[in-house]
């Protein structure tokens, strides 16, 4: 009897251990999903789409199988060829999406095998009847205002705080674009008096450009893990980009240091580290291995993965923007792990916690990576960042939160004040409280800074550049453009009728934004469903032309005055 009892106890313990292991694995997978995937994917049985398709019931589903979602042509072809998401296929895809399905728009994988296995286990448990809801009908009179068919070079926009609708005035849309090949003969539309041409083409679809002192154009090929460089022999067009550095981890932001004609380093922001590469003016190949300057940027690296760099005007401060891990931090709880005063003394006024610790911020360091401190908080995703060459002001373009409606809240461009709090996640555009976090931080009311320029909601402003014609530039823009800021609007997914997909000119007066912006380059949207281009970054070339990087078509466009 004693032997039988011991055997039963052992079996029970083994069963409990197995159950505990399964629960732990499920929790680990769910945590991985929340920290890395939830910004873009839902797991509800309605298969609602965000920037990416719904993942409920993904195991056993054919690739590109969510009705109504605008998949890349690469995944559509894979699904048509019979690709189905088994555990093995999903594991391979998540390890390296671009290698498994070349041409996919999935931006980032899960390289760690154990973490990936837990995520696949979690997704495997999302099974049951699918109750896909019919797409909401667009309220055309309200939603088409500010949409793509309003785009027209020369059109001026001025959105005011008093223009904001209430939350949930429209339903939240999952309306990502289907990217098509550029139709023969199609070109972007630019203002009268300007001409647009192809400057370079790169199948790796780089995103952010940076001009070197000698005029070379550096490009962050984020998905490839490379930095590339373009050299235009005649100023009009460039040959195929050359690879400057490889082996990087989703590089995005770049900055030369020190400023001036003879920098010593190219600083590069990886997804969770800052490195610097020895550089001398005119180098086309890295002259040394990357040196780690900051080994870890934040405890989590999922969610928004772009990191942008800039140096202060005196070269003494290295600035870094880090986007949020989630849409609106609903999972972090109402209180930090220590009293708010103590927490904010370490992380800044309005600094979030949990998976959002040191996220949605601009951080500051000395050029050697030491003396880390919080520069500003509440900036959900400052993708574009620069230091104004005249005023020395730090400036950000910010992608605001999703799922409050087609026209709420606006994205924005703003000067960023040291110690400033810009609202996220509890407030938006000043003292407007997010209803999903209602009542959690009344102490912050009145502390959120209203941004300088409100941009049509869900436009997704990315890279920007102050227009300053280099000395002796042969293709300088007219004088009235001098000092204004060009911004690439990547385009919406969370709006019933898409918006963005253009480059705009932000009007400045004595280095201060006026609040108005003007359409400058458009014409990349084919219909409510399809686009052929998505502006991601801008730079002023050595000859004064404006370069626009399109990361959908892999094209660098050149815009110059007609002579």
Regions found by a protein language model. Give the residues of each.
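Sequence/structural segment immediately N-terminal to covalent heme-attachment motifs in c-type
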Residues: 25-46, 55-56, 119, 200
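Beta-propeller domain segments
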Residues: 137-192, 263, 324-373, 377-521, ...
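Hydrophobic core register within WD40 beta-propeller blades
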Residues: 209, 254, 309, 382-385, ...
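Gly/Gly-Pro-rich "capping" loops immediately C-terminal to redox-active cysteine motifs
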Residues: 30, 42-87, 105-107, 243
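Asp-box/WD-like beta-propeller blade repeats and closely related beta-sheet repeat scaffolds
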Residues: 241, 250-251, 255-257, 264, ...
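Conserved beta-propeller blade signature
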Residues: 216-220, 263-267, 317-321, 393-397, ...
């Amino acid at each position: 009897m004693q032997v039988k009892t011991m055997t039963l106890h052992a079996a029970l313990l083994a069963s409990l251990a197995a159950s505990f292991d399964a629960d732990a694995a499920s929790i680990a997978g769910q945590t991985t999903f929340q920290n890395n995937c939830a910004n873009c994917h839902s797991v509800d049985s309605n298969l609602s789409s965000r920037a990416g398709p719904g993942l409920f019931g993904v195991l056993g589903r054919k690739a590109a199988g969510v009705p109504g979602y605008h998949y890349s042509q690469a995944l559509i072809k894979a699904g048509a060829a019979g690709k189905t998401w088994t555990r093995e296929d999903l594991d391979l895809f998540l390890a390296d999406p671009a290698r498994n399905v070349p041409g996919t728009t999935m931006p980032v994988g899960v390289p760690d095998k154990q973490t990936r296995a837990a995520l696949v286990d979690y997704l495997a448990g999302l099974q049951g009847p699918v109750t896909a809801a019919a797409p909401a009908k667009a309220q055309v009179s309200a939603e088409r205002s500010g949409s793509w068919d309003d785009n027209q070079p020369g059109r001026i926009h001025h959105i005011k705080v008093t223009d904001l609708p209430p939350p949930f005035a429209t339903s939240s849309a999952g309306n990502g674009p289907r990217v098509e090949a550029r139709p023969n003969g199609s070109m972007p539309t630019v203002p009268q008096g300007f001409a647009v041409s192809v400057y370079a083409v790169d199948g790796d679809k780089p995103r952010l450009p940076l001009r070197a002192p000698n005029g070379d154009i550096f490009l962050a090929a984020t998905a490839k893990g490379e930095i590339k460089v373009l050299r235009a022999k005649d100023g009009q067009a460039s040959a195929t980009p050359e690879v400057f550095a490889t082996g990087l981890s989703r590089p995005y932001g770049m900055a030369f240091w020190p400023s001036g004609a003879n920098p010593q380093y190219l600083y590069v922001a990886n997804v969770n580290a800052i490195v610097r590469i020895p550089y001398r003016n005119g180098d086309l190949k890295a002259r040394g291995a990357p040196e780690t300057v900051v080994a870890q940027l934040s405890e989590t690296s999922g969610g928004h993965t772009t990191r942008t760099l800039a140096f202060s005007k005196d070269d003494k401060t290295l600035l870094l923007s880090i986007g949020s891990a989630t849409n609106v931090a609903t999972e972090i709880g109402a209180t930090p792990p220590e009293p708010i005063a103590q927490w904010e003394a370490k992380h800044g006024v309005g600094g979030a916690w949990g998976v959002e610790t040191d996220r949605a911020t601009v951080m500051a360091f000395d050029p050697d990576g030491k003396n880390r401190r919080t520069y500003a908080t509440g900036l959900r995703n400052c993708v574009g960042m620069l230091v104004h060459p005249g005023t020395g002001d730090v400036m950000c373009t910010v992608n605001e939160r999703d799922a409050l409606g087609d026209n709420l809240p606006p994205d924005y461009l703003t000067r960023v004040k040291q110690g400033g709090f810009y609202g996220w996640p509890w407030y938006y555009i000043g003292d407007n409280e997010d209803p999903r976090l209602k009542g959690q931080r009344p102490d912050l009311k009145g502390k959120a800074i209203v941004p300088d320029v409100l941009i049509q909601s869900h436009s997704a402003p990315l890279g920007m550049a102050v227009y300053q014609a280099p000395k002796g530039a042969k293709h300088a823009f007219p004088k009235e453009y001098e000092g204004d800021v060009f911004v690439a609007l990547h385009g919406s997914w969370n709006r019933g009728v898409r918006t963005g997909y253009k480059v705009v000119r932000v009007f400045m007066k004595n280095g201060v934004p006026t609040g108005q912006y003007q359409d400058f380059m458009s014409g990349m949207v084919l219909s409510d469903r399809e686009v052929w281009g998505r502006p991601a970054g801008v730079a002023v070339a050595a000859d004064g032309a404006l370069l626009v990087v399109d990361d959908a078509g892999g094209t660098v466009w050149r815009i110059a005055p007609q002579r």
